[in-house]
Amino acid sequence: MRAIRMLLVSALAMGAVSAHADEKDVARLTQLLEKSQTITARFSQLTLDASGTSLQEANGEMAVKRPGLFYWHTDAPQEQVVVSDGQKVTLWDPDLEQATIKKLDVRLSQTPALLLSGDVSKISQSFDISSKEQGEVTDFTLKPKTKDTLFDSLRVSFRKGLINDMQLVDSVGQRTNILFNGVKANEAIPASKFKFDVPKGADVIQE
C-alpha cells in the first residue's frame, strides 16, 4: 500500500492536441482544482515497476473536502484507511490492529492528496506545470521544483472538468495509476467522514 501512503486511462481517439504556456497551465489547473470543494468517488489503483510489470492492484473509495480533509479507504485486496482531519493524518491497518498518527504535511510535493483537498493557490511554487488537451480530456504534468519529494512527476487528468485519473512516477521509475469512477463534486459530506476513532485496544504509533 505504498502508493496510498504517498497520496495520498482509456485510450482516446486521435484529435487535436494543444500545449499551453506555463502561466496559463497554472491558472487552468488551479481553476479546475478549486472548482470542486468536495469530491467523492470510487477508485482503482495499479502499481507497475519500471519495466511495466504489475506489482499491486487495489480499489476502494475516497472523499475529499477543502481545506485539507481527506478519506481514502482501500477495501481490496488488503483493507487500509487513511483519514485527514486537516491537522493530523491517521493510517489504520485493521489486519495489524494498528493506527499510525502524524501531523499533516501541507506541502503539496509531500502529500499529493492535498491537490484535491488543500490550498492550491501557490501550486506554482512547488511544481513546474505543463498541460495537454485532447478532446474532452485535459492532462497536467507536475514536476517538483525540489528534490525532497516522494515522486519525480505527477500527472493529473480531468474529463469534462472533473478529476479522472492520476499517475505518480517515483525515482526508480515505478508508476502508480489511480483511476476514479462515479466522481461527484460539491455534494455535502458528513464531518464524521474525516474523523477516525481508533478502536479500543489497538496499537497506536505517534510520529
From Swiss-Prot:
Ranges annotated as spanning the membrane: none
Residues in the signal sequence: 1-21
Keywords: Chaperone, Periplasm, Protein transport, Signal, Transport
Keyword Signal on entry: yes
Localization per record: Periplasm
Superkingdom of the organism of origin: Bacteria
GO annotation (BP), single: lipoprotein localization to outer membrane
GO CC terms of this entry: outer membrane-bounded periplasmic space
Gene3D superfamilies: Lipoprotein localisation LolA/LolB/LppX
Subunit organization: Monomer.
Family the entry assigns: Belongs to the LolA family.
Protein purpose: Participates in the translocation of lipoproteins from the inner membrane to the outer membrane. Only forms a complex with a lipoprotein if the residue after the N-terminal Cys is not an aspartate (The Asp acts as a targeting signal to indicate that the lipoprotein should stay in the inner membrane).
Protein name per its UniProtKB record: Outer-membrane lipoprotein carrier protein
Taxonomic source organism: Pseudomonas entomophila (strain L48)
